[in-house]
């Protein structure tokens, strides 16, 4: 495993982050054995959220039983809408942070993210609350998940004008598998920086040196190794409806075909190529990966050792016809 420090977080993050939105944890079941195995792979950073069912409770159970809170980095999120009701308000933010403390069994969260945005809300009000918790030592870095780079810039302008800590981290969708449709929809919805239409966003992250925590890094399973590039109809049977809505488009099957070809040439797997593509970007990015078995995480982590040439990165993403 490789590790990297980011601003306002005392401990280094593992370059691959384990996503805790998996059935066993969402249902609040005992995931200690799985988390032990993931941790043994060197993964020390775990992503969860207030609205991931009982995921925080399951993670907190493991932290308590193993006594390793000081050795791991916790990412959690709040202010997700419920029943079509936007919840990006100071009151909901405070409620969700406090509830996460209780569920996780901790008095601080290393990285806290606004899970969704509400364009009707001035971001400065969120910046004020997050700074209160940061000043009290209850959260480290903070930022947005599914916030556009323009909205983050707006929040950071407010922070600069008022002498406050700005957003220093962001968690949009990012991966070789372009999120062409919104998997969940509703409101401002999901934000992606993948694909040809989001080159400006990626340049902004590079220029502003804000690290990206990339969710759905394998396209909700489309680039996880089971889907084949020559079988779109079969993919629709393998993937969940949200993944089909977000990722099952001809462009992504062409990307998958190229990933299959390169994986064969480099004697590795499709998910390893897809993760290596993320890790070989020209900006700071940490892919989030989930799995029901730690062996898959161990396999995926080998992507850290794969070096891709710039021409290969561009070819995989359909930005050039030849390598």
Task: Give the ranges of each region predicted by the language model.
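Active-site mouth loops of central-metabolism enzymes
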Residues: 19-29, 78-92, 120
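Conserved beta-strand positions
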Residues: 18, 48, 76, 111-114, ...
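Short, well-ordered coil/turn segments that N-cap beta-strands
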Residues: 11-16, 42-45, 68-72, 106-110, ...
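Short, acidic/polar
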Residues: 26-38, 88-104, 153-157
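Active-site groove signature of glycoside hydrolases
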Residues: 101-122
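N-terminal binding-site loop/beta-alpha segment at the start of enzyme catalytic domains
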Residues: 1-73, 135
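Beta/alpha (TIM)-barrel catalytic core signal, keyed to glycine-rich beta->alpha loops juxtaposed to Asp/Glu
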Residues: 121-323
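A short, structured active-site edge motif that brings together acidic residues
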Residues: 70-83, 170-174
């Amino acid at each position: 495993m490789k590790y990297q420090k980011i601003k306002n977080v005392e401990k280094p993050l593992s370059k691959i982050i384990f996503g805790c939105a998996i059935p066993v944890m969402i249902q609040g079941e005992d995931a200690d054995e799985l988390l032990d195995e993931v941790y043994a792979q060197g993964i020390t950073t775990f992503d969860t959220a207030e609205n991931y069912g009982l995921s925080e409770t399951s993670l907190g159970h493991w932290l308590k039983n193993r006594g390793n809170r000081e050795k791991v980095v916790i990412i959690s999120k709040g202010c997700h809408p419920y029943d079509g009701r936007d919840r990006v308000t100071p009151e909901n933010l405070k409620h969700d942070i406090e509830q996460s403390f209780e569920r996780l069994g901790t008095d601080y969260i290393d990285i806290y993210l606004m899970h969704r945005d509400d364009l009707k809300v001035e971001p400065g009000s969120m910046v004020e609350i997050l700074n209160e918790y940061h000043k009290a030592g209850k959260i480290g870095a903070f930022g947005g998940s599914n916030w556009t780079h323009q909205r983050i810039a707006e929040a950071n302008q407010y922070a600069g004008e008022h002498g406050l800590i700005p957003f220093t981290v962001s968690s949009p969708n990012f991966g070789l598998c372009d999120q062409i449709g919104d998997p969940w929809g509703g409101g401002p919805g999901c934000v992606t920086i993948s694909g040809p239409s989001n080159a400006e966003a990626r340049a902004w992250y590079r220029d502003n040196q804000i690290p990206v925590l990339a969710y759905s890094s394998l396209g909700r399973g489309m680039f996880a190794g089971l889907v084949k590039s020559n079988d779109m109809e079969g993919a629709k049977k393998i993937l969940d409806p949200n993944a089909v809505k977000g990722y099952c488009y001809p462009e992504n099957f062409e990307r998958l075909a190229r990933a299959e070809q390169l994986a064969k040439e480099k004697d590795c797997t499709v998910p390893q190529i897809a993760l290596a593509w993320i890790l070989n970007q020209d900006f700071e990015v940490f892919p989030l990966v989930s799995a029901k078995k730690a062996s898959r995480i161990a396999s995926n982590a080998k992507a850290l050792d794969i070096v891709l040439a710039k021409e290969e990165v561009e070819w995989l993403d359909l930005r050039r016809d030849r390598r």
